[in-house]
Amino acid sequence: MKYLKHILSILAFFTIDQFILEYIAVYVTTVFNGSITFMVLCLLLLQTFLISFIVLWMKKEIPLNLKFPKWKWFYLYFFLLVILLSILEAWVKNIFHNFIVLAPSVSNVKLPSSVYLKGAGISSILFFIYAIGTGPIKEEVIFRAYVMNAFFKNNKYHLDVLLSGLLFGVAHLVFRYRDPISFVIYFVYGLFFAGIYKKYKDIRLVILLHSFCNFYVYVKPIWIFIYNYIFWNFLV
């Protein structure tokens, strides 16, 4: 019965995150005749409230120690491992690119046409903030802090790590991809983050690693932008 309560809670959190928050953001944008930027900003604020609620829920429902251990400099080696994993991921996706299937990109709700007429604004920057900020925080709070403290906590067979990695892979399979290769990739990422969280009990570390992993995707376009800006403004 205890596990059932946690399972239903996790499903409820994902339902709220993937569907209800979007409806609320679109409704508020429509009422105030806002832009895409306004909608994405609303979504970020709503997700911040959801993360705060999840943390409060966890503190109430499970034994949870949110004290942060002292930062250790050898943690930096894990960031190098993230780079290696990202390079390996790119290599695998390049080899099997014909088998990578993205989930249908269909919005759950329709925005008024007037929203699009106002332009994108800074929505790209806000999506970037989501990718390296609220997204990793939300996923690590759920998949690491919640799942690993609610199910098989400190299991000597590392079932907590396996479950965390499995759910991380399944979530990306449901919401972003439709192929087994992507599932394996995110399952490995999930095991990596879960193993580090179990070893060091530092949610900050796995959030930063996850955030850095997502940021690494943007390194090339950011470098191209900086190079072009310097070239055309100072060298030509």
PLM segments and residue spans:
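Membrane-water interface at transmembrane helix exits
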Residues: 21, 25-29, 55-59, 63, ...
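Membrane-helix interfacial "entry" motifs
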Residues: 2, 32-36, 40, 66, ...
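Juxtamembrane helix-loop-helix connectors linking adjacent transmembrane helices
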Residues: 31-37, 62-135, 227-236
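Alpha-helical transmembrane segments of multipass membrane proteins
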Residues: 13-21, 46-51, 81-89, 93, ...
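Alpha-helical transmembrane segments
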Residues: 3-20, 77-82, 161-165
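Transmembrane helix-loop-helix hairpins at the membrane interface
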Residues: 121-236
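Cytoplasmic juxtamembrane interface segments
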Residues: 51-72, 205
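Alpha-helical transmembrane segments in multi-pass membrane proteins
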Residues: 6-60
